[in-house]
């Protein structure tokens, strides 16, 4: 029986002054262990989602933990039958998750971590303001009961949203969450810098919550968007039924795919009447390349305008 592919989402905010020099040995460790996916490294830490065999993931994690700064690196695992990534990359970045606000550093100031088993009690408190820090297309397919959707299209928009809608003098308790924990951790550092006093964030993110909290006790509704070919996972972390429109990145449901406006790789009901002609032509060309690669049984990066984006985890 074929062993499932292990998908590991990992990150750690830690000062890596030598991050440029780390790139090549880290890339070699990924190659040596047969790992696919992308890792981002910056002076503020490391972030990414990778996949491989059980032995490969264990080998990579063991290599990372030989560095004393990485001994307690956070990672979550799920499984799938097919390789969700096609390439092996290590990228140098200014930020491992891009907020775009100078001086925000979770290594120096961060909110209160909340374990998954304590999350339900916290968000049941009527005085707690619950904010989903993810992008609008992620929120559309699943979120926590009672969560506020900022309707942002990128994490860079989050600071302006907070400034326009919330006041530290009025909103005393704030709880935030994201896919794997990294965005809400950085958001908590930003919120504290803006004067918010009680700031909480879900440790390990939604993925850790789904892993540890039984479905009969859950306050999660829907699927969870993930940044790989699986597109979404269910509460049991199995692959969901969504695909992703390669033109606009929006998750598309079974119902969406039945629409006359859905053309695989080219358009969906969410974008068919909004796509610029140049984008549409590029999507058509990319889809032809994908189909040709499939016919030749060769891997090909997923469609137009889609990027593996571990920085959004």
UniProtKB/Swiss-Prot annotation:
Catalyzes oxygen-dependent 5-hydroxyuridine (ho5U) modification at position 34 in tRNAs. The keyword tRNA processing applies. It catalyses: uridine(34) in tRNA + AH2 + O2 = 5-hydroxyuridine(34) in tRNA + A + H2O. The lineage of its organism: Bacteria, Pseudomonadati, Pseudomonadota, Gammaproteobacteria, Pseudomonadales. SMART domains: RHOD (SM00450). InterPro entries: Rhodanese-like_dom (IPR001763), Rhodanese-like_dom_sf (IPR036873), TrhO (IPR020936), TRHO_N (IPR040503). The gene is trhO. This is tRNA uridine(34) hydroxylase. Residues 124-218 form the Rhodanese domain. It is an enzyme of class 1 (oxidoreductase). The keyword tRNA processing applies. Pfam families: Rhodanese, UPF0176_N. Belongs to the TrhO family. It comes from the Bacteria. CDD domains: RHOD_YceA. Keywords: Oxidoreductase, tRNA processing. PANTHER family: RHODANESE-LIKE DOMAIN-CONTAINING PROTEIN 7-RELATED (PTHR43268:SF3), THIOSULFATE SULFURTRANSFERASE/RHODANESE-LIKE DOMAIN-CONTAINING PROTEIN 2 (PTHR43268). GO terms for biological process: tRNA modification. The active site is at residue 178.
